[in-house]
Amino acid sequence: MFTYATTVSTLTSTAILAYLTRHYDPEHKFSFDDDLDVSRAEQWMAWQHGGLGPMQGQANHFNRFAKERIAYGMQRYTGETERLVGILDKQLKSNDYLVGNKYSIADIANFGWVHMLRFSGVELDDFPSLKAWWERVLARPAVQRGLSIPSKGPFGNDAYLQRLKDDEEFAKTERELREKIKAAKEQYGYKYSSP
């Protein structure tokens, strides 16, 4: 929740980003003054809020936190996350950023989920345009500062890969998890097809 006045609060990342850009980005460094680009940015923010975030969140739940491994849930939400990041990958094949060829609130809204993609059971390397975008956004000094507040977390793609290298027990557990996800997909006939 973001409280920006003594009597008004805003929740959800989409509403917070919209408020911040309306009130603190008059030069449109992260937002747009063109109506079509404003609509495109809102579209990608809503798409993340209603699609990628909930589906990847469910993939995290079924793959990581559920008391019992339920094959249908694992393949359903991992597969849906793959489908959705495939849409991002397609958008980024001919664009450096999601809207208007500049880093914007649309990228900010989607970055956090992509930053934790591997933790969700989806391999970022399978989506080369998305991976290149993630690397561009991750290289921004302000993004690095933001990721370190309060401290760098263990779920980002870079931290995940480092832990795979450094912790053999973790790597073994991850290989087993990937095998369970693969088996669940096979059990239910899931086949990824790029958009």
Predicted regions and their residues:
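Acidic/histidine-enriched, glycine/proline-rich intrinsically disordered or flexible terminal extensions
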Residues: 150-195
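A contiguous, mid-protein "functional segment" used to position or interact
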Residues: 116, 120-166
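Solvent-exposed, charged/polar functional surfaces in cytosolic regulatory/catalytic domains
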Residues: 23, 80-83, 87-91, 136
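Residue-level signal for nonpolar/aromatic packing positions in well-ordered secondary structure
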Residues: 16, 41, 88, 107, ...
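GST-like domain detector, emphasizing the conserved glutathione-binding G-site
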Residues: 1-75, 79-82, 177-195
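GST superfamily/GST-like fold recognition
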Residues: 51, 56-60, 98-126, 131-137
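Surface-exposed helix-capping loop/turn segments at secondary-structure junctions
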Residues: 26-27, 90-102, 142-146
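Tryptophan-centric aromatic hotspots in well-structured domains and transmembrane helices
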Residues: 11, 45-47, 77, 85, ...
